[in-house]
Amino acid sequence: MSAKEHAIELLKSLETGDTQPLSYIDPEHYIEHNLNVADGLEGLKAYFASRPKGTVKVNTVRAYEDGDYVVTHSEFVDGQKKRIGFDIFRFANGSIVEHWDNMQDAETKPSPSGHWMTDGPSEVADRHKTADNKALMQRYMDDLIAGRRETFPSFFEGVNYIQHNPWVGDNLTGLIAGLQALAKQGLAVKYDRVHKILGEGNFVLVVAEGLFGDKVTAYYDFYRIENGKLAEHWDTLEAIPPEGERKNSNGKF
């Protein structure tokens, strides 16, 4: 069984109550970065036990692999509440040794352009371009953080950019208008630091830290790259709780 299959089965066990996928975790070295879950395998077991069988539905719509890392993009339904999440699993010697995630409440209506937070393509292409596509996203984020906005049009095809963020429309004009509208509501998007860039072929995930309004926030931005341009975007953002409210001391990143 592949690392991707292990990751998907572990997430699905939240729904099924099957404890066998917990055996994919290294009990001696597992590090948890979900700040609402206690550290180690015992902390994860306690979290799973707190979600009785049948109360959570899990649908993983995408899974990608980059070296020792697996990235998944999933829908989680807990009662009447639906959340969208990216999970990152790091593997060593065939076992899961570290986990990060980022969750956002799903909206009840689509984006201004009619897209949902998880729909769209999922099949990997251009695996030979993985390194180039990750480097492209590093350059984009470097320019974004440095405020070099004059370079932005060069990263997009303009009218061929599909946006799955629920508050933002398609294309570069939709992106700019959406961000301006959020800023007027006191919810300006600001990136301060990139922590990880992971990818497989034409899909790249950027894990970053910044502010959403006045809240310290984790940004997970997931891109589909086509012909060296940003063609499609999905994301989740999650406020980082203050230290006194965290269940482990490993940090969000």
Feature names for model-found ranges:
Residues 1-253:
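C-terminal and inter-domain tail/linker signature
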